[in-house]
């Protein structure tokens, strides 16, 4: 039940094992095009792969999304915050107008981006200085592209692929020439946001 599998079924794959799945998909989406319900199967993350900071969010079936951003600078201390400084935000909004560009590429709009705390607000608790910020990764534009598994890597700018290469290609040579995961692209800022399969509440409970 992957987006890649849906693509293969929609484009006449010879694999007949997914016939029941394709019937189920057809009942949900007559056109066979990508829906927000497809994207709701994934969690999305924007980070460098080196740890320290990340932006994480999930999209629901209606296009709404919710997530958080965090970064830390434990060396940035003061009299009241000897344990360092944290940058963070909680955010929510909605993606709309999911439009097909080609077999592997869609475009969508972002609306109503709101924050749990006002960006710029600061507070100190438990020896840590908390600074609330804008969300890193979704700024600078209200238009985003979605690239699906199978999309040629050459369709992405070097700046964008830099952010997702480590999640997309586990070969030492870096020879993967197509996407293996869905990604969201902020072209205005040159950001690529990778994805992984979303856990169910039961799976999340088991992993904690």
Name each region found by the language model:
Residues 50-120:
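N-terminal glycine/threonine-rich, aromatic-flanked beta-hairpin/loop signature
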Residues 1, 95, 144-148:
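Generic hydrophobic, helix-prone segments enriched in Leu/Val/Ile
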Residues 28-56, 66, 187-207:
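Tryptophan-anchored aromatic micro-motifs
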Residues 1-46:
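N-terminal, intrinsically disordered, polar/charged segments of Gram-positive cell-envelope systems
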Residues 37-39, 60, 139:
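Surface-exposed coil/turn segments at beta-strand junctions on protein surfaces, enriched
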Residues 117-207:
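Beta-strand-rich cores of mature extracytoplasmic or soluble domains
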